[in-house]
């Protein structure tokens, strides 16, 4: 099954899981919690506020050497969107890719995703832990702040 078939398959719509594929094309599902979704939404809102030169959006599918990975949030420049529009999945990574850790994720899994996204052209990889603390990475090191969106906060707070 290819990515477009997975997206179109009626039995796979409206699942309470995020779908990705592994390097062999097998479907991998990750459960989503409301806390995860709330953090994802706040990050998207903050990106829209602090990075007006592009578009922030959730659930960005990216073709990698290890299958299709779906970033929790991505930010793409106008130039990226002019090149790729709504391709599904994207053949390269948007400039900023954000993953929100959940109980089912390991740091090793996030490190692998980070490397896969950089190999596809990401400029920065951001990681949000379960408490909202942000870490920013380029392909060489951990950054004190994002170089692309320097006003982005180092902690995402929920309204409760």
Regions found by a protein language model. Give the residues of each.
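Gly/Pro/Ser/Thr-rich low-complexity, intrinsically disordered segments predominantly at protein N-termini
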Residues: 1-160
């Amino acid at each position: 099954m290819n990515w477009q078939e997975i997206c179109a398959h009626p039995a796979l719509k409206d699942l309470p899981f995020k779908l990705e594929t592994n390097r062999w094309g097998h479907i991998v599902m990750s459960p989503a919690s409301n806390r995860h979704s709330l953090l994802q939404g706040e990050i998207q809102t903050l990106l829209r506020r602090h990075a007006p030169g592009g578009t922030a959006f959730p659930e960005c599918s990216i073709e990698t050497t290890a299958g299709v990975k779906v970033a929790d949030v991505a930010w793409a420049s106008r130039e990226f969107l002019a090149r790729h529009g709504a391709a599904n999945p994207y053949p390269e990574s948007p400039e900023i890719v954000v993953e929100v850790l959940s109980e089912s994720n390991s740091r090793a899994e996030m490190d692998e995703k980070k490397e896969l996204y950089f190999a596809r052209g990401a400029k920065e990889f951001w990681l949000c832990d379960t408490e909202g603390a942000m870490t920013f990475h380029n392909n060489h090191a951990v950054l004190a702040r994002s170089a692309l969106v320097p006003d982005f906060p180092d902690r995402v707070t929920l309204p409760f």
